[in-house]
Structures are given as C-alpha cells and as structure tokens.
Amino acid sequence: VGLESPPKLAVILSQVKFLSRFYIDGFILGIIIAGVLGSVFPVSGTAESILNWATKIAIGFLFLLYGARLSPQEAWKGVKHWRLHTVVLAATFVLFPLIGLALRFLSPTLISDELYTGILYMCLVPSTVQSSIAFTSIAKGNVAGAIVSASFSNLIGVFVTPLLVVLLMNTTGQATVDFSSILDIVVQLLIPFIVGQLIRPLVIGWLQKYAEPIKYVDRGSILLVVFAAFSESMKEGIWSTITIWQIVILTIVCCLILALVLGVTTLAGRKLGFDLPDQIVIIFCGSKKSLATGLPMAAVLFAGQPVGLIVLPLMIFHQIQLIVCAAMAQRFANRDPVSVS
C-alpha cells in the first residue's frame, strides 16, 4: 500500500488470494481499532503534546522510508510506454479531482463540509503500489507496466497532491493551506522523502533484508497518525456533528465514484487501442487511492482541522476498492481467452 518498493510476485499472489477469499484488509482493521481507541481514550495536556511531537517524527520517518524504498530507476524505466502511464496518471490526477469538484453540491445539504473536504482530498491522493500490482498480476495483466505506473504515480504524488490541495481546496474554501502548512509539507514530507531517495543506495539492502519487521514500524507510524487524528476530533466534539445518515451517504458516494472511475478507465483502455493486459493496468492502477500515503499527508496538510473526519472518506473508499477490485481480478483471471476481444 502506498509508497513502497514493488513486492515480490509470490508475496503479491499470496496476499491477493487472501484478499479475494475474505475481502478484508487487516491494515484497515488496525486503522479502525486505532480510530476507536483515539475516540474512546482521547489524550490531553502533556500527553497530547508528546503525542503531537511523536506523530510529527513518525510522519517524517515514514516519508524517509518511502523515499528510500521507491526506486526512481523503476519509475522512469517505463517512460517508453508513455501512453499507458499518461492514461493512468490522468485518471489519478485529472479524472478523480474533476469528480471531486463536481460533488461540491453534496455539502452542506447531504454531508458536512468536513466530509466533503475528505471526499475532495481523497480524489487528490496518488494511486497505491502494492494492491495495484497485486490485482494486475492476479488478473493476468501487464505486471511490469503496473509496477512502473504505480511507482511513478507515487513518486510524483508526493509533490502533486500537496500542490493540488493548495490550488483546489483554497480556491473552493474547503480548507485553509497557508504558508505555515506549506512549510510543514516541505519539512515533514518533501525533505524526508528526498533524503530517503538520496540515501537509498546505502540502505536499500538493509531495508530489503529486514522488510518484514520494518513493515510493522511503517504501519505503526500510520496507526499513530490515525489515533492522534481521532483523539483530536473527539476532544473537539467533531463526531457529534456526524449522523449515521451522512455515513450511509458517504459510503454510497464512494461506491459511485469508484464505479464511475472503473467505467471511464475501462472505456478509455478500449477506445485508445490498448491490448487487454494494458487495459487491466489502466483499470487497476487508475482507480486506486493510497491510504498509506494519504493518511500521514492529511495530518500535515490539515493540521489544526478535523483530520479524523477528513480522512474518513479515504478509509471507506480504500476498503471498497479492495473488495470490488479483488472480485474483478478474479473475474479477469477466470475469463475465457477465446472470448476476449
């Protein structure tokens, strides 16, 4: 999930088989538990100050790891197949944002301003790496193309997503990203990411050797961000403003967004003359949104705002995309080669 080096194919396949059987993402369960704990046991005073600093350090370390893991050579290797990657990037950073802007009418009539901000933010984050590659593999698509597209999306997403937030959310009045926020983006996100890229040749062997324990440090940092966000939301009384009806509407909206993007990417792949393996890349890489990148980035971009509510649409969308895409991947895998056009 998120900014990470492409996993080995055997690991990918085992994870997809698990997903396709149970349709439950263990990472999502951990995030839900962290959110519940933050809501039930909100911190304050000295503990809150310590938590805030720990969260900032965790986010910086997280993006340092992201930079060290992501191979720029891998991302640039597929430039020769630029048409494929252009379509995927257009789906991620053009189609999704346009859909998010078009849904402005939902607020405040059907959902709160904070939830709409979350929907728009969800539409601005980059694609995933691991699940995009995993589903492409199980669907018998162009795995090499998926690796390049997903990696490139994450590589530029670290820079493009904050830029889109500044441009789109400030102009629509959905969030305030001032100079202080931009400075936080540079200090907590961009500098650690660039440092990670620079030290990658020195540490990549160590990261690969200890990939399994580092994964838990990686995810633990994200869980800390979620706990802090929900703790702050509970302390500010934000959750009392949300109704079950709004959650239902939010879930329906996330389903409709995914359905629309899947429809457009499917049609685009066919109409633009891509073969089926490349169409699969466009469908799975172009429809994903990264939880691992989006959550910590939101904590920086929306500091002082109800982050717990803002990331809620991304959390819901992430689980929906896993369920739907796992089913689609199995359907592609079981297709009749003779009947495929």
Label the model's feature ranges.
Residues L3-S107, V166, N170-F274, D336, ...:
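Structural signature of multi-pass alpha-helical membrane transport proteins
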Residues K77, Q130-N142, L267-K271, M297-A303, ...:
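Helix-loop junctions at the membrane interface of multi-pass solute transporters
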Residues W82-L89, L110-L124, G141-S151, V248-I249, ...:
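The feature identifies polytopic integral membrane transport proteins across all domains of life
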Residues A91-I99, L124-V129, G145-V166, V186-L189, ...:
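Membrane-embedded alpha-helical segments of transport systems
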Residues R104-F159, M169-S181:
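Membrane-interface helix-loop-helix junctions at boundaries between adjacent transmembrane segments
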Residues G237-I244, M297-M315:
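Extracellular/periplasmic helix-loop-helix junctions in multi-pass membrane proteins
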Residues V261-G269, M297, V311-P337:
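Membrane-helix cytosolic exit motif
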Residues V264-M297, S339:
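C-terminal hydrophobic structural anchor segments
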